[in-house]
Structures are given as structure tokens and as C-alpha cells.
Amino acid sequence: SSAASDVYKRQEPTYGLLRSIGRDFKMLVSPFSGQRHAFWPMVQKFGYEKACAYRDLFHMEGMDVMRFSLKEVVTMINDFKERFVCDYDEYEILACHQANKLIISNLARKIKFPLSKIPLSIVDYGNTGCASIPLAICEHYSNKNTSQDSGKILTCGFGIGLSLGIVGITVEPQNCFPVFRVKERYDDGLSFEDYK
């Protein structure tokens, strides 16, 4: 699931909905990551290489995840719209999790939100997981010459757990820094061999 932090003092309220469909968690799961199966106890039990293999396991039932995205996320967005009596015209963009382009375009079609108002950072960066929402927001404002003080946007995240959420926020475009690309990468000099 994707998250973004936008911390500043504002007078406008923030509206949102959060949901979890825990019974279907096995559709999209990283079964041996996180606190449920801590890494070092797995090393002690299985050895380092097997623990690394377990930690890196990821399972996704693709068609079920697609159905979840196009059913549950659509339902949640429609519930948000109804509960908070809002219109899509109020929002500059819908910054949603960049799972894949097919999900995004079908989601836009189903909720009748203009695809032109959904930044597609997935095209340049791929699925960046929890960074995809703030990346989409920053890409949108860095590609737009704006002097506006604020912009209303919808953010929508969904994914592992099967968790999903939508929040309507007001951002200050001048605080959305441009994304820049570098060719270099930092090499910390560490290797897995150092920790066996």
C-alpha cells in the first residue's frame, strides 16, 4: 500500500477513507518479511542463505489482484465521493498508486475520472511501491509551471494486506520538489557476505 506524508498547518479539513480486506491477504503477500517473521531468528533456524531466500519471497495472484483493484478500489472511491459530497472537478489530479498502467487506465474509466488528470510516473519509473504516490505528485508539479498557492488533489493507495485508502488533501505546489535523476549510485561497500 502506498503512503505519502504532507505535513503543514492548514485551515482546510482533510477527508479520507481507509479499508482492509484481510481475509484475502494471501492474494498479495510477502510472507516472510516484516515483524511476523523477523529475519535474524530465521537465520538462526534455517541458515543465512535460506533466510535470505525466504525474506525475498513475494506472492501475487495477478488476476485476483486486478479484480481487487478494479472492484474494491472503485467502490471505495465512489463511497468517498458520496460520503464527502465532492465532485472530481474540485481536484487537480488523482495521484494513485502506480501498480501498472492497465489498472490505472481501467480505474479512471470505471470511476469516470479523466486519465489526463492522473499523473503516470509508472511510465518513467515503474512500480515504485509506497513511493509511487509522492513521486506522482512531485512529477506533476515539477512538469507544470505554476504560481498557485495551493492545489486540491486526491491520493489513492492500495496493495499488500489487501489494504486501500483515499485521502483528499490540499498541497502547496512550491513544496513539491522536482524529481531529479542521477547516473551515479552510492556504494556503501557492504555485502551480504559481511553478515554471514
Describe these PLM feature segments.
Residues 1-8:
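Short, small-residue-biased leader/transition segments that mark boundaries at the very start
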Residues 2, 86-89, 148:
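Structured loop/turn residues at beta-strand edges in well-structured enzyme cores
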Residues 5, 15, 27, 166-168:
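Conserved hydrophobic/aromatic beta-strand scaffold that supports enzyme active sites
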Residues 9, 16, 158:
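Fold-independent oxyanion-binding glycine-rich loops
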Residues 10-12, 177:
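Beta-strand initiation motifs
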Residues 13-49:
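Mobile, glycine-enriched helix-loop/loop "lid" segments at the mouths of ligand-binding/catalytic clefts
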Residues 40-93:
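Oxyanion-binding "anion nests"
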Residues 70, 74-77, 92-196:
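Claisen-condensing/thiolase-fold acyl-transfer catalytic domains that form or cleave C-C bonds
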